[in-house]
C-alpha cells in the first residue's frame, strides 16, 4: 500500500469580502499517514477537514506545501493518476445500473477482461457480504447496503490509498454503529492505508489508529485516541474529545500553607493539590482554569471527613440506562458528573462533591495550552 506525507500544506481562497482579503482554509499542516494506517481527521463543521481530504484526492489545488505518496510528490497529478479511491457521504451510485455493474464500472473503463472483472466483483461482494444484492438496483437497497456498494466500488480498484469523506453521516444511529464495526473489520482484512474524515468524535475514537484534530484550518493535535482523551495538548482538544464534554472551571489561584486551591468565588474553593505544574507556581492571585472529566468527579450523599468536599445542587439528570449524567450547579456554571444508575438522584438534592487533584488538567488562560500534573 502507501505512506502519505503532508508537508506544510495550506489552502488559500480569495475571500469575496475585499476588506478581509485572502482566507486560509488550511494553515501549514504537516503529518504522515503510515503505510496500512487508519488515520481519522476530525473536527467541527467548517474546520477544513473535507478541504484537506479533497486536496489529498486532487479535487482541490494545494496553495502551499507538498503532498507525497511513497516519497513521490503528487501536487500536480490529476485525481485519476494518484491511485486513490474516495468514498463520499452521498454514495454516488449510478441508479440505472445494478450493484454488479456499479462495482464493475471503473474496471470496464480500464479495459479489464470480463473474467477478471467478475472475479474481483465476486471477491469484493463476499468481503462486504452483499453477494445476494449484486443484481439489484440501488433504489431497492437500504442505506447501509448502498454504502457497502460504494465502499466495494472503491475496494475493487485496489488503490494505494482509500479516502472516506463522512461516509456514515446519512445512516441512522444503529446502522452507523454497525458500519463502524464493519469498517474496522474491512481495514484488518485488506490491510490498506485509509484516511477518514468525520465530525463525529465517536467514529474517530473507535476507528482511528491515530486521530488528527482540526480547528479553524489548523492541526490542534495528532495522537492515538487514548492519548487525546487522557493527555490533550490544549483546551480545544480537551473540550472536543469526550462525551459528555470535559468540565472547565475558572477561578483565582491561591495558596494556603503548602497547598494550592482554586477560588471560584468568595465562598467556594477547590483544592488542586500540594504540587501544580511549574508554569503556574508563580501565578498566585492570577486567573487559572482547570478541567476534569465527568467520570472523575466524585459525588456522594455522605461527606468524607478525610477530604475537602463541598455541597452542590442537582439541576438536572439524565438516566442513560447503565449510568446517570448528573448536572450540578456551581455558581454560574453547570458541571456534569457520571453516577451509577443504581444510585438515587433527584432534582434539588445536594451532593458532596470532590475533584481529585490527580485528575485535573491546568489550562493557561492566555493561549489555551494544557499542563498535566507531574
Question: What are these language model-derived features?
Answer:
Residues 5, 32, 68, 352-354:
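ABC ATPase nucleotide-binding domain
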Residues 29-40:
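Pre-Walker A (P-loop) beta-loop-beta motif of ABC nucleotide-binding domains
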Residues 42-44:
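The feature captures the beta-strand-to-loop junction immediately N-terminal to the Walker
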Residues 57:
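Helix-to-loop junction immediately C-terminal to a conserved catalytic motif
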Residues 65-73:
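Conserved ABC transporter NBD signature motif
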Residues 82-236, 240:
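ABC ATPase nucleotide-binding domains
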Residues 255-374:
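Non-catalytic connector elements of ABC transporters
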Amino acid at each position: 500500500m502507501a505512506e502519505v506525507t503532508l508537508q506544510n500544506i495550506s489552502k488559500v481562497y480569495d475571500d469575496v469580502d475585499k476588506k478581509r482579503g485572502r482566507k486560509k482554509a488550511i494553515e501549514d499542516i504537516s503529518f504522515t499517514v503510515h503505510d496500512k494506517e487508519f488515520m481519522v481527521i476530525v473536527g467541527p463543521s467548517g474546520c477544513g477537514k473535507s478541504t484537506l481530504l479533497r486536496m489529498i484526492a486532487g479535487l482541490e489545488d494545494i496553495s502551499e506545501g507538498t503532498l507525497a505518496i511513497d516519497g513521490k510528490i503528487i501536487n500536480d497529478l490529476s485525481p485519476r493518476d494518484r491511485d486513490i479511491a474516495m468514498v463520499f457521504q452521498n454514495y454516488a451510485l449510478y441508479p440505472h445500473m445494478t450493484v454488479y455493474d456499479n462495482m464493475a464500472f471503473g474496471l470496464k473503463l480500464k479495459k479489464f477482461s470480463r473474467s477478471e472483472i467478475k472475479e474481483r466483483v465476486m471477491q469484493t461482494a463476499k468481503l462486504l457480504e452483499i453477494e445476494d444484492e449484486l443484481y439489484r438496483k440501488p433504489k431497492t437497497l437500504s442505506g447501509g447496503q448502498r454504502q457497502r456498494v460504494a465502499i466495494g466500488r472503491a475496494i475493487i480498484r485496489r488503490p494505494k490509498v482509500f479516502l472516506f469523506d463522512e461516509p456514515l453521516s446519512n445512516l441512522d444511529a444503529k446502522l452507523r454503529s454497525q458500519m463502524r464495526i464493519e469498517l474496522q473489520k474491512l481495514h484488518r482484512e485488506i490491510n490498506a492505508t485509509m484516511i477518514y474524515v468525520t465530525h463525529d468524535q465517536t467514529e474517530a475514537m473507535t476507528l482511528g489508529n491515530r486521530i488528527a484534530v482540526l480547528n479553524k484550518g489548523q492541526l490542534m493535535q495528532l495522537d492515538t485516541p487514548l492519548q487525546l482523551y487522557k493527555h490533550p495538548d490544549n483546551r480545544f482538544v480537551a473540550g472536543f474529545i469526550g462525551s459528555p464534554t470535559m468540565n472547565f472551571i475558572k477561578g483565582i489561584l491561591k495558596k494556603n500553607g503548602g497547598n494550592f486551591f482554586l477560588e471560584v468565588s468568595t465562598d467556594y474553593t477547590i483544592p488542586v493539590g500540594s504540587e501544580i505544574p511549574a508554569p503556574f507556581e508563580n501565578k498566585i492571585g492570577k486567573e487559572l482554569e482547570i478541567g476534569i472529566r465527568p467520570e472523575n468527579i466524585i459525588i456522594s450523599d455522605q461527606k468524607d471527613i478525610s477530604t475537602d468536599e463541598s455541597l452542590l445542587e442537582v439541576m438536572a439528570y439524565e438516566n442513560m440506562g447503565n449510568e446517570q449524567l448528573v448536572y450540578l450547579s456551581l455558581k454560574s456554571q453547570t458541571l456534569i458528573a457520571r453516577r451509577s444508575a443504581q444510585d438515587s438522584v433527584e432534582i434539588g438534592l445536594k451532593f458532596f462533591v470532590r475533584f481529585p487533584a490527580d485528575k485535573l488538567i491546568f489550562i493557561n488562560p492566555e493561549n489555551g495550552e494544557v499542563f498535566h500534573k507531574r
